[in-house]
Amino acid sequence: MRANCSSGLACPANSSEEELPEGLKAFGNLDLVFTVVSALMIGLLMFSLGCSVEVQKLWGHIRRPWGIAVGMLCQFGLMPLIAYLLIISFSLKPLQAIAVLIMGCCPGGTVSNIFTFWVDGDMDLSISMTTCSTMAALGMMPLCLYLYTLSWNLEQNLTIPYQNIGITLVCLIIPVAFGIYVNYRWPKQSKIILKIGAIAGGLLFLVVTGAGMVLMKEFWSSDIILLMISFIFPLIGHATGFLLALLTHQSWQRCRTISLETGTQNVQMCFTMLQLSFTAEQLVQIFGFVLAYGLFQMLNGFFMVAAYKMYKRRLKNKHGNEKPSCQEARHRKKSTSPKETTAFLEVNEEATLSPGPSGPVDPHGAPTPTGDIARAK
């Protein structure tokens, strides 16, 4: 099925004899290799991240899915709406508008999971949101596209990549399930696997980012408006996702997680859908946007992680220079606060800053009598 973006824009079926542009030709030749390698790498990465998931916490998110519900609202409520508002604000052409809207309707990608781990987010919630959004995409993608294109002149429906969604689910659920099992049976070994996976994920992201910059060299001057949208779109998603999580009284850890999940989209699924729906001649007009969005969401993620690490180190240094009396006073203030968290970074230092007992303690839990009471005895 093909999409006719306007009454004057025809979308005939793709043919193998059609001449591809250089950028798309290189991408098409490496598409199969990239798909297989990325599937294996993502599978191994999700296995290592699954080693950080605890069964009890995961069941808690499923039994009380408030965080998942907020994340789904951000994913399929805010992101399509943001895409639609950007389309109206920049008065995009029909073909460009469809590309931006499809990106907004796609589920969250696995990139957000490793970024969530690096910012000390809620990994159980992150993996739950990625899995649930991918499953919900089977119905929510067609629904969102239908609702937002009611006023558009579309003669035929867009092609939903159900096969790609199914492959993504398999690459998510099976490795994560094995990781959860390893963490349940061998918790010490799972921590080692998690550290190795985090390093491998970082190297993989650096390679993907570098490859994206090389492929983007032919598209930097293609359309400035699309490049601008590809830069601000994920940033707006991160900001609005964080604000919605904050308004629904989620913890700071969950706010960071939902923010990253909201702005990070499954770029490969978006490109697959565009490839199934348009010809190569039309695809070259919007390929730069898809590639730029994936590149900018990577760069945004690295920037957020770097900012978090710097602020966390600064916070630890500040607390380390405090006098013991100030630390005890701050600890007493924390212990009397009914809130779940007290700082955006949620640096858990109560264990290290907690003052020890002032006197000897009885092994059975009863305090040793001192002062006048001891003399009376």
Swiss-Prot record:
Keywords linked to the UniProt accession: Glycoprotein, Ion transport, Lipid transport, Membrane, Sodium, Sodium transport, Symport, Transmembrane, Transmembrane helix, Transport
Cytoplasmic compartment segments: 51-67, 119-133, 181-195, 245-257, 307-377
Side Extracellular, residues: 1-29, 89-97, 155-159, 217-223, 279-285
GO CC aspect terms: membrane
Residue span of region Disordered: 319-377
Residues bearing carbohydrate: 4, 157
Pfam families: SBF (PF01758)
GO function terms (MF aspect): bile acid:sodium symporter activity
Catalyzed reaction equations: estrone 3-sulfate(out) + 2 Na(+)(out) = estrone 3-sulfate(in) + 2 Na(+)(in); 17beta-estradiol 3-sulfate(out) + 2 Na(+)(out) = 17beta-estradiol 3-sulfate(in) + 2 Na(+)(in); dehydroepiandrosterone 3-sulfate(out) + 2 Na(+)(out) = dehydroepiandrosterone 3-sulfate(in) + 2 Na(+)(in); androst-5-ene-diol 3-sulfate(out) + 2 Na(+)(out) = androst-5-ene-diol 3-sulfate(in) + 2 Na(+)(in)
Subcellular location field: Membrane
Membrane topology: Multi-pass membrane protein
GO BP of this protein: bile acid and bile salt transport
PTM entry text: Glycosylated.
Main location group: membrane
Transmembrane residue ranges: 30-50, 68-88, 98-118, 134-154, 160-180, 196-216, 224-244, 258-278, 286-306
Superkingdom as given in the UniProt entry: Eukaryota
Role, per record: Transports sulfoconjugated steroid hormones from the extracellular compartment into the cytosol in a sodium-dependent manner without hydrolysis. Steroid sulfate hormones are commonly considered to be biologically inactive metabolites, that may be activated by steroid sulfatases into free steroids. May play an important role by delivering sulfoconjugated steroids to specific target cells in reproductive organs. May play a role transporting the estriol precursor 16alpha-hydroxydehydroepiandrosterone 3-sulfate (16a-OH-DHEAS) at the fetal blood vessel endothelium.
Family: Belongs to the bile acid:sodium symporter (BASS) (TC 2.A.28) family.
Name recorded for this polypeptide: Sodium-dependent organic anion transporter
Organism the protein comes from: Bos taurus (Bovine)
